């Protein structure tokens, strides 16, 4: 069996990835499938950190546009990510995989506080670490949280798992002529305003030379093939 190319990864999942076709909430079958794939990565010797968005439950920015205070909306979004993190923890533990949920907000009755050194130690012991509550601050996306945590834990690769195959010059659903990028620099993505991650997340990755792979989470086994060395999705690097 081919040895994994990456020893430690940070996998960013959108909250929408968990809801399937339901429109909201968590699809139990999709949750189980994603947990199974993550467990297989661990069995292959990869240390896995996770950041899961909360868009399947609530989006703070959207609530703000509806009249809710932005900070309050963002705090609601952070709590939504904790709900998703606990669901993933349960799904992984049902497979026998040890997991720790670490929150940027203090919720000691349900998860640990985020402490970088402790998180790294959990990873070294083969535990999946799910980083919840974003950065713990309003106005920052979970994409920014994923970039930050990937840098902090010294991940070899940040993977953004999406519903599309990678980075395009435009929405491929709306524009069949959209160009697919197999590789590009962060500066190119920023200059062209490509819809990859928000500016803060991209600049963090660029400045700290964190490679980012954007790929389709719904192609079963794709993450494992990537870890084994296949060229899947789009790769973003510091120029």
From Swiss-Prot:
Pathway: Pyrimidine metabolism; CTP biosynthesis via de novo pathway; UDP from UMP (UMPK route): step 1/1. Its EC number is 2.7.4.22. The keyword Cytoplasm applies. GO terms for molecular function: ATP binding; UMP kinase activity. It is an enzyme of class 2 (transferase). ATP binds at residues 12-15, 55, 59, 162, 168, 171. It catalyses: UMP + ATP = UDP + ADP. Keywords: Allosteric enzyme, ATP-binding, Cytoplasm, Kinase, Nucleotide-binding, Pyrimidine biosynthesis, Transferase. Residues 20-25 are annotated as: Involved in allosteric activation by GTP. Its main location: cytoplasm. GO terms for cellular component: cytosol. One of its GO terms (biological process) is 'de novo' CTP biosynthetic process. Homohexamer. Catalyzes the reversible phosphorylation of UMP to UDP. This is Uridylate kinase. It comes from Methylococcus capsulatus (strain ATCC 33009 / NCIMB 11132 / Bath).
């Amino acid at each position: 069996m081919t040895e994994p190319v990456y020893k430690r990864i940070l996998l960013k999942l959108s909250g929408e990835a968990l809801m399937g076709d339901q429109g909201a909430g968590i699809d139990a079958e999709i949750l189980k499938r994603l947990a199974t794939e993550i467990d297989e990565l661990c069995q292959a010797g990869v240390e896995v950190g996770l950041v899961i968005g909360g868009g399947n439950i609530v989006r703070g920015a959207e609530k703000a546009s509806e009249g809710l205070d932005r900070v309050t909306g963002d705090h609601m979004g952070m709590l939504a990510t904790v709900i998703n993190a606990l669901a993933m923890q349960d799904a992984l533990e049902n497979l026998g995989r040890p997991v720790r949920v670490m929150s940027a907000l203090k919720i000691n009755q349900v998860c640990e506080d985020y402490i970088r050194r402790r998180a790294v130690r959990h990873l070294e012991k083969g535990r999946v670490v799910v980083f919840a509550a974003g950065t713990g601050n309003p106005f920052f996306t979970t994409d920014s949280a994923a970039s930050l945590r990937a840098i902090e834990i010294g991940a070899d690769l940040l993977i953004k798992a999406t519903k599309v195959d990678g980075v395009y010059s435009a929405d491929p659903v709306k524009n069949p002529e959209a160009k697919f990028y197999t590789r590009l620099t962060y500066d190119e993505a920023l200059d062209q305003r490509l819809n990859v991650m928000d500016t803060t997340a991209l600049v963090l990755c660029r400045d700290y030379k964190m490679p980012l792979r954007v790929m389709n989470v719904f192609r079963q086994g794709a993450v494992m093939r990537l870890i084994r060395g296949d060229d899947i999705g789009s790769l973003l690097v510091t120029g």
